[in-house]
Swiss-Prot record:
Reactions this protein catalyses: guanosine(1516) in 16S rRNA + S-adenosyl-L-methionine = N(2)-methylguanosine(1516) in 16S rRNA + S-adenosyl-L-homocysteine + H(+)
Gene: rsmJ
Claim: Cell membrane is one of the keywords in the record: no
This protein's record includes keyword Zinc: no
Record-given protein name: Ribosomal RNA small subunit methyltransferase J
HAMAP family: 16SrRNA_methyltr_J
Source organism (scientific name): Escherichia coli (strain SE11)
Amino acid sequence: MQICLIDETGTGDGALSVLAARWGLEHDEDNLMALVLTPEHLELRKRDEPKLGGIFVDFVGGAMAHRRKFGGGRGEAVAKAVGIKGDYLPDVVDATAGLGRDAFVLASVGCRVRMLERNPVVAALLDDGLARGYADAEIGGWLQERLQLIHASSLTALTDITPRPQVVYLDPMFPHKQKSALVKKEMRVFQSLVGPDLDADGLLEPARLLATKRVVVKRPDYAPPLANVATPNAVVTKGHRFDIYAGTPV
């Protein structure tokens, strides 16, 4: 995959070249999307819209730390949707990991989560965020146990992941209407890189065959059900719903 690669670390140690080789990235000076290694982290920038800033994965500080400490925990909609109850903490495959937010929330309340991400740039961002998270004194211990990244296409990986999870979670890219600055900024940069999930409808059936208990699909409230398969079961929040489908028991 081609992207503009920029090293702002000033160390000259070739770390960016190693990273590019690992994820199969080729430097393209004219690409509007840039993957930038800063002294702090790896980030994605849209070069023709510098005001949008850089997008990076941060499990330790910022919004994710606030959500972990002051969010709803088990009361969050995603936790309810996957079926967390009492001692039951399902094993989850997040087949559309993105920036890992929902996966992190589930891991923070005790679930083991395997994140699938097919885009090599997004996978590199997730891997960078995980490395910093694993090294953190406060969350590193449980994060290493509960949150993992698998760089693979969901459409193929969903048929051969072992062991089978109890829950498969899907949050395919869907055009957003929200006006919130953060969503607009992230979605604009993100969609410039990966585009809409045009094959997302094809995820539902393999997900249902893989999950032993249920499949949860996050949708904007205005979006039709995935693959146009309606379900009466959903957790509804302001702006979103989490559609719930039966899996395939062992």
